[in-house]
Swiss-Prot record:
Alphabetized NCBIfam families for the sequence: ispG_gcpE (TIGR00612), PRK00366.1 (NF001540)
S-S bonds: none
InterPro entries xref list: Dihydropteroate_synth-like_sf (IPR011005), IspG_bac (IPR016425), IspG_bac-typ (IPR004588), NO2/SO3_Rdtase_4Fe4S_sf (IPR045854)
Signal peptide boundaries: none
Domain of life: Bacteria
Natural source organism: Nitrosomonas eutropha (strain DSM 101675 / C91 / Nm57)
Cofactor(s) the record lists: [4Fe-4S] cluster
EC supergroup of this enzyme: oxidoreductase
Record-given protein name: 4-hydroxy-3-methylbut-2-en-1-yl diphosphate synthase (flavodoxin)
GO molecular function, one term: 4 iron, 4 sulfur cluster binding
Pathway: Isoprenoid biosynthesis; isopentenyl diphosphate biosynthesis via DXP pathway; isopentenyl diphosphate from 1-deoxy-D-xylulose 5-phosphate: step 5/6
Family annotation (Gene3D superfamilies): Dihydropteroate synthase-like, Sulfite Reductase Hemoprotein, domain 1
Record-level GO BP terms: isopentenyl diphosphate biosynthetic process, methylerythritol 4-phosphate pathway; terpenoid biosynthetic process
Amino acid sequence: MSSNNVPAPRRKCVGVKVGSVMIGGGAPIVVQSMTNTDTADELATVQQVEQLARAGSELVRITVNSMEAARTVPAIRARLDDMDCHVPLVGDFHFNGHKLLTAYPECAKALAKYRINPGNVGHGKKRDEQFSILIEMACKYDKPVRIGVNWGSLDPEMLARIMDENARSPDPLGASQVMHKALITSALESAARAEELGLGRDHIVLSCKVSGVQDLIAVYGELAAQCDYALHLGLTEAGMGSKGIVASTAALAVLLFKGIGDTIRISLTPEPGGDRAREVIVAQEILQTMGLRAFVPLVASCPGCGRTTSTYFQELAESIQIYVREQMIIWREQYEGVENMSLAVMGCVVNGPGESKHANIGISLPGSGETPVAPVFVDGQKTVTLKGDNIAGEFRVIVDEYVRTKYRKKVANA
């Protein structure tokens, strides 16, 4: 039993190898994302996959919905490998996946995992046949499968069966509970059928996606208690901007705190012209804020108030945040553990010095109306006071020096 302020131990589950990435089995929680390009557009898809991988996505899902898309997948994989981008690709199949995987074996081989929605692989006998073909292809090419159930596309026959059973029950469930049961039943029955067809438990990941925060928490709590498959977490559509971030964080934080979840995806609606990689950064920040993984040094900064020199303080905090994320591309390759470094950029003398001492490196500005004079604290000790017009640049030099001297340099592979 965990204490009230410590996350529960991770739920034990069967590990699933996806290319070079392990999901579940005690492995770190995996961050993944999905492209929104037409997969038949090779160049656009390669560029976006590379962008997402560079941002930190450890798996990238691509839509495979047409003959043109299926034909293009091997070329996408080859071009990414030529760019030294080896992120595993997951094929997202709906309606016609059985045909595409059968007709294009090179596509089947190039993908590291298949995503199947049991609610849209046909109905009745066709559903059984088409689902069987998908699983047989996964077995043939030794590929893991995510059986991804979605409340917007539940198998109508299965849903009708559960509703009929509920209607005959002396203690019937409410509508939302029936939906939860249907999602879980679809996932578990599909997984059991996949095993009957020869797919190992170590090749199966499950997800039951909904849009409501409370629904997601309830469904995954029940699903986690009923199986030991690896679980993929995420709202099916979180929304745009702050709403999407808040909804995803509210749902996933509760489940992750309970030890539930082996891979996550934040399904944000991009703003027009927005950066697709934002969903990757949000996923990383959720995990890092909860102490479950570390990706980049955390920069703590106060919100500002009437005591802060707002513009200068905000510009300094932003510049350090951007600098650290950009430098991590280099630091990650050169220094062990640098992602655990903590920084603080504080705006005034009320809490600034104290907060700065809690970080590995902290800087505290004096406050509103005063000439910028900023003491810097390194591992709790005041080391220097920065003045003048280049405080940000001098602080970056201090951060660089700290990284070089405090973190062990990685040994290059022989």
